[in-house]
């Protein structure tokens, strides 16, 4: 089902009468969307090496000859297959009748959940320095998080996104006369977008590849993506990225009312910085086909 909760509040008032004022606000969103889904897993016969349901011959890659009775000895399974088939907590057996030529399509029913959390708030202060000078300062902070879709199987991996943002601004208005007003402003903003795979079950960790017989280091939790032909692939490429945008703005504007003419003088300088990390299309953990 779908559920969304939005909540928050505002509060403000004077700190010093006719001189100093403040305002704060907060808004939060929690969104959940869940329901049933199906996927395909290897049946018990396949886990025992019995591939007699396949219409074509099974060829032994070591000699190019058909496998007798389409029965592969379990002793010839690689470490990844043995670890996968020997751990039903990570890779469960079918729990319903499948369909398709081999009867495995949709043979496992599970649930999914899409999760979104969002928090944002502001703090603002106004200060009247003098009849001719007014200062304003504001700080804003936000955190938008999507947790993707909760995986149907522990060995499936989905991705999540963290999007923290923050900004600050200081503004000074100076009235020189009834016809001349100056506005000066300095601001800063930062937007970060972080994409990462999620180990929903917590059973994989950073040593899953080693436990599944896959060599190489593993800097993030998860399992390398293993593509298969008849049932759903497992694991994840582990595609990760981290992008941080920083923006600095310096602004000044002088407004002068000269008889019938309105004259504006000033400038706007912006410094933009982007720092980006991307693991590549093959991800951190890679893929096996």
Predicted regions span which residues?
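Short acidic-glycine motifs
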Residues: 1-289
């Amino acid at each position: 089902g779908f559920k969304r909760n939005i909540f928050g509040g505002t509060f403000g008032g004077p700190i010093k009468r006719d001189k100093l004022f403040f305002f704060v606000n907060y808004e939060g969103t929690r969104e959940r969307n869940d329901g049933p889904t199906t996927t395909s897993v290897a049946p018990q016969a396949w886990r025992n090496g019995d591939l007699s349901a396949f219409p074509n011959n099974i060829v032994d890659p070591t000699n190019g000859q058909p496998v007798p009775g389409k029965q592969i000895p379990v002793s010839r399974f690689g470490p990844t297959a043995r670890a996968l088939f020997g751990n039903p907590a990570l890779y469960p057996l079918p729990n319903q009748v499948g369909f398709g030529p081999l009867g495995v399509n949709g043979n496992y029913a599970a649930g999914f959940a899409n999760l979104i959390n969002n928090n944002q708030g502001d703090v603002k202060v106004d200060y009247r320095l003098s009849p001719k000078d007014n200062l304003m300062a504001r700080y804003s902070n936000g955190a938008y998080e999507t947790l993707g879709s909760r995986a149907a199987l522990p060995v499936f991996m989905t991705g999540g996104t963290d999007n923290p943002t923050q900004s600050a601004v200081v503004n000074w208005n100076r009235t020189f006369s009834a016809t001349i007003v100056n506005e000066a402003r300095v601001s800063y903003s930062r937007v970060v977008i972080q994409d990462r795979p999620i180990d929903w079950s917590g059973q994989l960790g950073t040593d899953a590849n080693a436990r599944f017989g896959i060599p190489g280091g593993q800097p993030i939790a998860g399992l390398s993506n293993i593509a298969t032909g008849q049932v759903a692939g497992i694991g994840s490429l582990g595609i990760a990225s981290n992008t941080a945008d920083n923006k600095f703005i310096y602004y000044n504007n002088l407004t002068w009312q000269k008889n019938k003419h309105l004259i504006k003088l000033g400038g706007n300088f912006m410094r933009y910085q982007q720092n980006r990390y991307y693991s590549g299309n093959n991800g951190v953990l890679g893929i096996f086909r």
